[in-house]
Curated annotation (Swiss-Prot):
Its EC number is 4.1.3.30. It comes from Corynebacterium glutamicum (strain ATCC 13032 / DSM 20300 / JCM 1318 / BCRC 11384 / CCUG 27702 / LMG 3730 / NBRC 12168 / NCIMB 10025 / NRRL B-2784 / 534). Substrate binds at residues 53-55, 129-130, 164, 194, 216-218, 247, 276. This is Probable 2-methylisocitrate lyase 2. Its cofactor is Mg(2+). CDD domains: ICL_PEPM. GO terms for molecular function: metal ion binding; methylisocitrate lyase activity. Involved in the catabolism of short chain fatty acids (SCFA) via the 2-methylcitrate cycle I (propionate degradation route). Catalyzes the thermodynamically favored C-C bond cleavage of (2R,3S)-2-methylisocitrate to yield pyruvate and succinate via an alpha-carboxy-carbanion intermediate. Pathway: Organic acid metabolism; propanoate degradation. Mg(2+) binds at residues 92, 94.
Amino acid sequence: MAGLFSSAVAPTERRKALRAALAAPEIARMPGAFSPLAARAIQEAGFEGVYVSGAVVAADLALPDIGLTTLTEVAHRSRQIARVTDLPVLVDADTGFGEPMSAARTVSELEDAGVAGCHLEDQVNPKRCGHLDGKEVVGTDIMVRRIAAAVNERRDEQFVICARTDAAGVEGIDSAIERAKAYADAGADMIFTEALYSPADFEKFRAAVDIPLLANMTEFGKTELLPAQLLEDIGYNAVIYPVTLLRIAMGQVEQALGDIANTGIQTDWVDRMQHRSRLYELLRYNEYNAFDQQVFTYSADSYKPIF
């Protein structure tokens, strides 16, 4: 479990854990955290990793996912999330916030944030949501330079660099596969196959590419929602649920606000709320209180560390 003010597991160890999860026969499941507290809940629920979605970072700022967020904003939220969990954190780094030199700087900043890895995509800059029409991709040569620059800048060899290709919806799946092979040759540790349609598409990609693959199970998009077990059986190594928790939370928020606006009282929602005691458990309130009591009653003669 994380320390009070930072994870008890060093960043390099969490990066090793992510690589081990990608090499395991079981698929690594990584829900998207819309806040540090959500990341802690993900860990307690028994998942293998935490995902930081660019769309969620943007939505939290009431912005659309069209490349408006900055590296500073994404790195800040990533650092906040990585601080509170012992799980590996994978971050959506969009296009790397520019061209190859910017992609290199992105990796440096995210390493400093303590996350386990990031993915860079082959859309033009600024990008748009991968499940919207009208997106464009850069040439394979440009994306290869992005990946190579990121790999070259990486200081910790355990840090995972994933290449996302959006080409399936633009140029077709065969082109996306050829791009994925080129990205792997450039040093990518994993391929994120965005906006595939059916199990057959996932199977075709798995048969053609021999490095770890990541599936995106996002709602209301172009991809059929598939069980983690089916993806594991196909041979995928990781699956993300990028906006799932935010959509659940905001759906409940809007319903509750509507009811309170109409009735003037929240009693119908009390049984559906997270109880105060459960919130305190997630916040580790008692551990902070014990720490505070130790400091408050501190004396040099009687001091006995409790951690």
